[in-house]
């Protein structure tokens, strides 16, 4: 049995998907919801050409022992927000356990399929685990993640450029609010490299992943075009946004379920899709500081394109 509790039901997700599509939006969570999307995501992660996943994973692998040394033997709850399939988390969980830390793992995600993988991976490694299906940026779900009086010290993980999938300035503050004195946050971000950053998204491998939720509702490659764009976010120097949208080249109908319900996109209409923020290093650290966090450790990937920081309340 794989223990997963749900604050967010599949029916709620289905209703939210239809509402978002009507508003011509396809939020981040739906790129990991459909079975086809999950399959495309796992294929993307398993291909070494997807450098962003590999940068984050290798940085965790290289730093896991050092990071684990920040925690004394004893109980520790590892709360992973946007855990996905949990494979990067598991590297750190094992390093903590090897140092005598009694880890309990609480992965949080909106994807039932990926959450099951995260929990199963931890259980197979002998680590206590309980999944929570939730949207951690919903205020009610965020409140439910607050520590109880009996909750042991916590390490909160927000890795894989997860802050960048939302508004990182707001998300960093929301996540920081979960920390008590003595709790720590491990977060990372992709560092901006101009055209090379955009090329990391606008390529056949990533396009397959981006197309997956559209394919799941009957929209095909010939129905329109995926467009990737980059712009600066002027709230901070060195804060950059990679966005994408689908532009219909002809009238298309998206299938909203087995009952024949469809939603039409007219030729020329746009469907806004998920985005990803990138940073210069000083801007990423400034965002953490603005959320009331003090960085205690930082590391970068071998190619200097990913920055990871361990921080606590200032």
Show the residue positions of the predicted features:
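A short His-aromatic
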Residues: 164-165
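Core SAM-dependent methyltransferase catalytic element
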Residues: 304-314
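Conserved S-adenosyl-L-methionine
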Residues: 293-303
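Rossmann-like AdoMet
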Residues: 1-80, 86-132, 140, 150-151, ...
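A conserved beta-strand element that flanks and buttresses the S-adenosyl-L-methionine
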Residues: 157-158
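Substrate-binding/catalytic lobe of Class I Rossmann-like enzymes that use SAM or dcSAM, i.e.
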Residues: 200-291
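Conserved beta-strand signature within the Rossmann-like core of class I S-adenosyl-L-methionine
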Residues: 179-195
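A short glycine-rich, Lys/Arg-flanked "PGG" loop and its adjoining helix->strand segment in the class I
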Residues: 169-182
């Amino acid at each position: 049995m794989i223990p997963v509790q749900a604050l967010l039901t599949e029916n709620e997700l289905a209703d939210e998907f239809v509402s978002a599509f009507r508003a011509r939006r396809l939020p981040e969570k739906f790129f990991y919801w459909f079975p086809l999307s999950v399959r495309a995501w796992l294929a993307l992660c398993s291909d070494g050409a997807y450098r962003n996943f590999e940068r984050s994973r290798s940085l965790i692998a290289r730093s896991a022992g050092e990071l684990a040394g920040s925690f004394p033997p004893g109980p520790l709850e590892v709360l992973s927000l946007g855990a996905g399939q949990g494979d990067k988390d598991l590297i750190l969980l094992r390093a903590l356990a090897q140092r005598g830390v009694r880890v309990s793992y609480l992965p949080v995600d909106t994807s039932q399929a990926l959450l099951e993988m995260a929990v199963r991976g931890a259980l197979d490694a002998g680590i206590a685990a309980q999944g929570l299906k939730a949207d951690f940026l919903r205020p009610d779900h965020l409140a439910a993640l607050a520590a109880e009086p009996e909750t042991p010290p916590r390490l909160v993980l927000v890795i894989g450029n997860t802050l960048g999938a939302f508004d990182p300035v707001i998300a960093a503050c929301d996540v920081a609010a979960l920390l008590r004195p003595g709790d720590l946050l491990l977060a990372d971000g992709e560092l901006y490299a101009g055209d090379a950053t955009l090329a990391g998204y606008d390529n056949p491998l990533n396009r397959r992943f981006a197309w997956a939720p559209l394919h799941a509702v009957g929209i095909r490659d010939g129905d329109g075009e995926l467009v990737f764009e980059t712009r600066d976010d002027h709230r901070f120097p060195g804060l950059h946004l990679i966005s994408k949208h689908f532009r219909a080249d002809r009238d298309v109908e998206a299938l909203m379920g087995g009952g024949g319900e469809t939603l039409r996109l007219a030729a020329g209409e746009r469907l806004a899709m998920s985005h990803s923020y990138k940073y210069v290093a000083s801007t990423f650290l400034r965002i953490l500081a603005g959320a009331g966090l003090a960085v205690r450790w930082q590391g970068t990937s071998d190619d200097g394109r990913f920055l990871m920081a361990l921080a606590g309340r200032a």
